[in-house]
Amino acid sequence: MSIKYVATSKLPTPWGVFAMHGFEDTETGKEHVALTFGTLSADEPVLGRIHSECLTGDALFSLRCDCGFQLQTAMQNIAETGCGFILYLRQEGRGIGLLNKIRAYELQDKGANTVEANEQLGFPADMRKYDMIKPMLEQIGVKHVRLMTNNPRKVKAMKEFGIEVVERVPLQVGKNRYNEAYLKTKSTELGHMMSEYHFVDED
């Protein structure tokens, strides 16, 4: 496995002080991060999330997606629970990279949905891989997970790498008029598990 643990530091946040663990993929050069909060147990289910990097949503407050809302809600939920983790994976734009993501956004501005835009650029709908999660979870000592996600591929990936997903915790937040079509596409074409009320316009 090409994932190498590098270092751990404190990360003060609005929800409390997390620990930030740095990892390097020596084959690709990508750097990944695990955030942990509280004392994690290898014997008990731990609340956690696998979160793929989204510069526009996580850092630039974009309303085109639900990523930033999901990240903040996951961190808040973990802090309120008292312990948990987030694996922050550097897989921008479902794996196509930032500049290609901007190209995909340009196509979406012209009418394509998020899947069509990727395909028009010559990419699959979702290029993300999850082989790095096993060594990262081994480093932070987690074997059983209550996974915050709407994406069945993440549940499947954890199970394939021998991580027990005790419960899938839905994370349906951040719906707005700019991302409603995007969320519907994630549900209908990418298989994300979202309830109908998530798409009802709010007054």
Curated annotation (Swiss-Prot):
<feature type="binding site">
    <location>
        <position position="65"/>
    </location>
    <ligand>
        <name>Zn(2+)</name>
    </ligand>
</feature>
<feature type="binding site">
    <location>
        <position position="54"/>
    </location>
    <ligand>
        <name>Zn(2+)</name>
    </ligand>
</feature>
<feature type="binding site">
    <location>
        <begin position="49"/>
        <end position="53"/>
    </location>
    <ligand>
        <name>GTP</name>
    </ligand>
</feature>
<dbReference type="GO" id="GO:0009231">
    <property type="term" value="P:riboflavin biosynthetic process"/>
</dbReference>
<dbReference type="InterPro" id="IPR036144">
    <property type="entry name" value="RibA-like_sf"/>
</dbReference>
<comment type="function">
    <text>Catalyzes the conversion of GTP to 2,5-diamino-6-ribosylamino-4(3H)-pyrimidinone 5'-phosphate (DARP), formate and pyrophosphate.</text>
</comment>
<feature type="active site" description="Proton acceptor">
    <location>
        <position position="126"/>
    </location>
</feature>
<dbReference type="GO" id="GO:0008270">
    <property type="term" value="F:zinc ion binding"/>
</dbReference>
<feature type="binding site">
    <location>
        <position position="70"/>
    </location>
    <ligand>
        <name>GTP</name>
    </ligand>
</feature>
<dbReference type="GO" id="GO:0005829">
    <property type="term" value="C:cytosol"/>
</dbReference>
<feature type="binding site">
    <location>
        <position position="149"/>
    </location>
    <ligand>
        <name>GTP</name>
    </ligand>
</feature>
<comment type="pathway">
    <text>Cofactor biosynthesis; riboflavin biosynthesis; 5-amino-6-(D-ribitylamino)uracil from GTP: step 1/4.</text>
</comment>
<dbReference type="InterPro" id="IPR032677">
    <property type="entry name" value="GTP_cyclohydro_II"/>
</dbReference>
<feature type="binding site">
    <location>
        <begin position="92"/>
        <end position="94"/>
    </location>
    <ligand>
        <name>GTP</name>
    </ligand>
</feature>
<comment type="similarity">
    <text>Belongs to the GTP cyclohydrolase II family.</text>
</comment>
<feature type="binding site">
    <location>
        <position position="114"/>
    </location>
    <ligand>
        <name>GTP</name>
    </ligand>
</feature>
<dbReference type="GO" id="GO:0003935">
    <property type="term" value="F:GTP cyclohydrolase II activity"/>
</dbReference>
<dbReference type="InterPro" id="IPR000926">
    <property type="entry name" value="RibA"/>
</dbReference>
<keyword id="KW-0686">Riboflavin biosynthesis</keyword>
<keyword id="KW-0547">Nucleotide-binding</keyword>
<feature type="active site" description="Nucleophile">
    <location>
        <position position="128"/>
    </location>
</feature>
<protein>
    <recommendedName>
        <fullName>GTP cyclohydrolase-2</fullName>
        <ecNumber>3.5.4.25</ecNumber>
    </recommendedName>
</protein>
<keyword id="KW-0378">Hydrolase</keyword>
<keyword id="KW-0862">Zinc</keyword>
<feature type="binding site">
    <location>
        <position position="154"/>
    </location>
    <ligand>
        <name>GTP</name>
    </ligand>
</feature>
<keyword id="KW-0479">Metal-binding</keyword>
<dbReference type="Pfam" id="PF00925">
    <property type="entry name" value="GTP_cyclohydro2"/>
</dbReference>
<keyword id="KW-0342">GTP-binding</keyword>
<dbReference type="GO" id="GO:0005525">
    <property type="term" value="F:GTP binding"/>
</dbReference>
<feature type="binding site">
    <location>
        <position position="67"/>
    </location>
    <ligand>
        <name>Zn(2+)</name>
    </ligand>
</feature>
